C-alpha cells in the first residue's frame, strides 16, 4: 500500500506535504492536477456505517459501488446531464433509475450528495471554513503505517460550512489526499468520521465505468 502511494505521488508530481508552508493550500493545488482517482471509503456517523468503492473522473464524474449497506448497488453521477443513474441491484440489472442529485433517497446516511462527494469539494469546504476561522497544524504522525500530517480547521464562533464547524484532517504525506477526516458541528459533536483506503491516483479509468 505504501509503495503504491509513493508511486502515485511520483507519477502525479506530488511533493511531500510537509514541504509546503501551507499544507492545506498545497493539497488543494495538487488535487487540481488529478484527472482520476479511486479509493475505498469507510464512513461512520450517527446513522450507521458505510463502505463504498469510489471512482472519480474530472470534471466531476462519480461512480459509487456500495459494499455496505445496500451491497451491490451502483450509483453514477454525470456532471454533463446533472443526473444520477442508480441500479439498486448492480449496474445493468433492473431497475435503473434516473434521479436528481438533490433527491433525498440517494443522499448518504450523513446527508452527503453524490455531486458534492469528491475530495475537491471537501477541500474547498474546509478552505472556506478556514477563511472564517483558523487552522492548527499538529505535525506529522503515523496512521495505519502511513506518514500523515495532522491538522484542525475550526470556524469562528457560530460559523459552519456545509453544517461543519470543525474539520480534523490527517493528510497523507505523499499523496496529499485525506487519509482520515473527522467533522464536528458547532456543539462539538462528531458528524462523521471518514477513512480513505486503497487510494490510486491518475490510473486511467475507462469511460464505460461511468457510462455502462
Predicted regions: what they are:
Residues 31, 116-129:
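Short, solvent-exposed helix-to-loop capping segments enriched in aromatics
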Residues 27-33, 53-55, 64-65, 73-77, ...:
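Short linear motifs in intrinsically disordered
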Residues 2-51, 56-61, 140, 203-205, ...:
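N-terminal leader/targeting segments and the immediate start of mature chains
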Residues 70-75, 85, 124, 128-212:
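Gly/Pro-enriched, hydrophobic low-complexity segments
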Residues 24-28, 119-123, 168:
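Extracytoplasmic/secreted envelope proteins and their assembly/folding machinery
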Residues 4, 24, 102-105, 119:
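Short amphipathic alpha-helical segments that mediate assembly, nucleic-acid/protein binding
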Residues 55-117, 189-192:
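An acidic-aromatic
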Residues 31-35, 88, 130-133:
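Sec/Tat-exported extracytoplasmic proteins
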Amino acid at each position: 500500500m505504501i509503495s503504491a502511494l509513493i508511486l502515485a505521488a511520483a507519477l502525479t508530481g506530488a511533493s511531500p506535504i510537509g514541504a509546503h508552508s501551507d499544507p492545506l493550500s498545497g493539497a488543494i493545488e495538487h488535487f487540481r492536477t488529478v484527472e482520476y482517482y479511486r479509493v475505498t471509503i469507510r464512513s461512520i456517523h450517527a446513522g450507521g456505517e458505510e463502505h463504498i468503492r469510489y471512482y472519480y473522473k474530472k470534471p466531476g464524474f462519480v461512480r459509487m459501488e456500495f459494499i455496505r449497506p445496500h451491497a451491490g448497488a451502483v450509483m453514477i453521477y454525470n456532471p454533463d446531464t446533472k443526473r444520477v443513474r442508480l441500479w439498486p441491484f448492480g449496474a445493468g440489472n433492473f431497475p435503473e433509475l434516473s434521479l436528481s442529485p438533490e433527491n433525498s433517497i440517494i443522499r448518504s446516511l450523513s446527508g452527503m450528495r453524490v455531486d458534492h462527494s469528491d475530495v475537491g469539494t471537501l477541500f474547498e469546504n474546509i478552505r472556506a471554513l478556514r477563511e472564517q476561522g483558523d487552522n492548527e497544524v499538529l505535525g506529522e504522525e503515523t496512521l495505519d503505517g502511513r506518514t500523515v500530517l495532522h491538522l484542525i480547521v475550526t470556524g469562528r464562533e457560530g460559523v459552519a460550512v456545509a453544517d461543519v464547524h470543525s474539520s480534523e484532517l490527517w493528510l497523507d504525506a505523499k499523496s496529499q489526499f485525506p487519509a482520515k477526516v473527522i467533522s464536528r458541528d458547532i456543539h462539538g459533536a462528531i458528524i462523521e468520521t471518514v477513512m480513505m483506503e486503497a487510494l490510486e491516483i491518475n490510473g486511467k479509468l475507462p469511460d464505460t465505468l461511468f457510462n455502462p
